[in-house]
Curated annotation (Swiss-Prot):
Protein name listed in UniProt: Kunitz-type serine protease inhibitor homolog T1-2 B chain
GO cellular component terms listed in the entry, alphabetical order: extracellular region
Keyword Disulfide bond: yes
Taxonomic lineage of the native organism: Eukaryota, Metazoa, Chordata, Craniata, Vertebrata
Tissue: Expressed by the venom gland.
Source species of the chain: Bungarus candidus
Domain spans labelled BPTI/Kunitz inhibitor: 1-15
Coiled coil residues, start to end: none
Record's function text: Neurotoxin T1-2 is a presynaptic neurotoxin of the venom that exhibits indirect hemolytic activity against human erythrocytes. The B chain is homologous to venom basic protease inhibitors but has no protease inhibitor activity and is non-toxic.
Amino acid sequence: RQRHPDCDKPPDTGN
């Protein structure tokens, strides 16, 4: 799956 690194990883800060 080719996606943005920001979207691939879960929201740590949940911002």
